[in-house]
Structure formats: structure tokens, C-alpha cells
């Protein structure tokens, strides 16, 4: 079966919320429900889901080759922006013209793009060797560079969650008898009966301290 995780799609978030957290009222899927929404951007939906679609036969080889070519163009452009360094003499007139702080030393095009007020489109004025990219590809290049640090932290959180998913919770656990586990957490865990530590960590009312108690109880801490 094809199982989409919380870090791969909003439908994965929706299913996980309904199965693990439950709901007493109509459920509305909003971006705020995802802790990984920086990874679940509109502009990178194809990079997240096309490989999965190809794997299960929903995407044919011709379309997948087009996808790979697009990803190669995006990757090459990000590399070019990182490696293209401009001197203050080259960049400062442009920066001052848009009200940005001028450079004191050389900076790459990627460094300039990381400034909140500068867009990829604006950089065309001082970027003579820019290749042709579609609007969609330009948006992905800009988003990937601007939010790289934040995305890296979220990817770290995803890896941590995957590791927690490997820790299974026995079905027979008496949560109310675990010393150090808060009453609210014990009640929620007893009612929902998560299958893994990862699922337990996603339950509203179960905090990181409760997860630490569970790991100690299981001898995994």
C-alpha cells in the first residue's frame, strides 16, 4: 500500500490526525495543522509526490523523465547562485536602488536572495548569465534558498520522528501505572492506545516530558 506520512503530504496529516488524535467536530484541513508545513509547500508538491506516483505506476516514464529534467535545472540553478559572487562595485548600485544595505565585501547571488526583501526576479538586473526557468521553477529556487535553514531543521525533526516510530508500544501497557507520567497524558494514551512512540508524541496532551517517561519505562532512554 501507499502510505503518505505527515512530512510528505497534507492528506497524510489529515489521516494521521483523524486516526491518532480523533475529533469531536467536523475536521477542516488547514496548513496550520501541519508541523512540517515549510516542507509541504505548493511549489514543491511535485518533488514530494511525483517519485511516489512513479513508484506505484501513477506516473509514466515519459512524465517522470520530464520531472527529473526539471529537478536537474532547479539544482543547477541553486548551485550557480551559490557560486556566483558579486563585488560591491557590481551589486551596490542595485542594492541602494531598492533600499537595501550595500555590500562591504563580495557576496554570492544566493546570499543576496536570502535577504527577505529581494526576490529572484529582482536579481535579474545584476545577473547576466541567468538561464531560462519557468515561473514555477523560479519559485522553487527562491523558496529553497530563502528557507534552507528552516527546512533543514524540519528535516531533522522528521528524522527524529521516524526514529520514534521505530519504537513500538506494547498493547498491554498500563499507562496509569507508569510512575512519572502525568494524569492527562496517561488518560489520553490509555484511550487512544498508540502503536508507537511516534504516534504517542503526536497526541494532544502528551508532551516531550511524557515521551521521555515512556522511553525510560521501555528501557530505550
Predicted regions and their residues:
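Extended, charge-enriched "interface" segments that sit outside catalytic cores
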Residues: 7, 33, 39-41, 45, ...
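Phosphate/diphosphate-binding loops
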Residues: 17, 26-28, 54-56, 60
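Active-site-proximal substrate-binding core of FAD-dependent oxidoreductases
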Residues: 1-26
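Alpha-helical protein-protein interaction elements
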Residues: 2, 19, 28, 139-142, ...
